Design a protein with these regions (language model features):
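Hydrophobic alpha-helical connector segments
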Residues: 65, 73-106, 154-161
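Helix-turn-helix
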Residues: 12-16, 20-58, 62
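Hydrophobic/aromatic-rich alpha-helical bundle segments in the mid-to-C-terminal region
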Residues: 122-128, 132, 144-201
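Hydrophobic/aromatic residues within well-ordered alpha-helical segments
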Residues: 13, 56, 63, 67, ...
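Solvent-exposed, amphipathic alpha-helical segments
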Residues: 16, 20-27, 74, 109, ...
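Amphipathic alpha-helical segments used for helix-helix packing
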Residues: 88, 101-124, 173
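N-terminal intrinsically disordered/low-complexity leader segments
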Residues: 1-12, 23, 199-201
Length: 201
């Protein structure tokens, strides 16, 4: 019983620290995500935080991993809805649009890491790896729509769609009135329809 209680306490602490890192990055930005600020949010000592993560870079990398997992889980759920290939492609891609508060927060984290990745090679490697995994997923979904005659062409379509959705997520984070949820959905629908039409014309 004592061991189970200890495990539960450890799990609760890990979750609290993870949430504190995520919320600090999302609300305050990468540059402001210091060990002290995260510790204050987690209501713990800086020593406990550093014992858990080791370094500030590792702490930031954890937040990026959380973003990967959240995005992947949403995409997996979309793929398991039993929709047709085109609808599945739309649902997965719309998971990265800022259609609700949760995804708005994720977009802010993504932008923060994109900026931090420029001068930091470790963060850049992690960021690029995650983005390439996403490109592989979207390329596979595009191919399932029979949009392309070759893997190269399928990837080209995927790059266009990702550029659109990531661009919309960024712009809407800065100007949500102009780039509303309805506008984002409409533009993604139009781009997918354009690709389908171009392939079958």
């Amino acid at each position: 019983m004592a061991e189970n209680a200890s495990d539960a306490t450890t799990a609760a602490t890990n979750l609290r620290l993870s949430q504190a890192v995520w919320e600090t990055v999302a609300n305050d930005g990468i540059e402001a995500t210091t060990v002290r600020r995260v510790a204050e949010r987690a209501e713990c000592t800086t020593g406990l935080l550093m014992h858990h993560f080791g370094t500030r870079t590792a702490m930031l990398a954890h937040a990026r991993e959380v973003l990967y997992k959240r995005t992947a889980a949403r995409a997996n759920n979309a793929e398991n809805l039993g929709l047709n290939p085109r609808e599945t492609l739309f649902e997965v891609l719309s998971g990265t649009l800022t259609l609700d508060t949760e995804r708005q927060q994720e977009a802010r984290v993504w932008m923060g890491f994109a900026a931090a990745a420029l001068p930091d090679s470790d963060i850049r490697k992690l960021h690029v790896s995650g983005n390439r995994d996403w490109l592989q997923r979207i390329t596979r979904l595009v191919a399932a729509c029979e949009l392309a005659a070759s893997p190269y062409a399928a990837q080209g379509f995927a790059v266009r769609l990702i550029a659109l959705t990531e661009g919309l997520a960024t712009l809407s984070s800065l100007d949500p009135e102009t780039y509303s949820a309805d506008i984002q959905r409409s533009m993604l629908t139009a781009e997918i329809d354009s690709l389908l039409g171009a392939q079958h014309s």
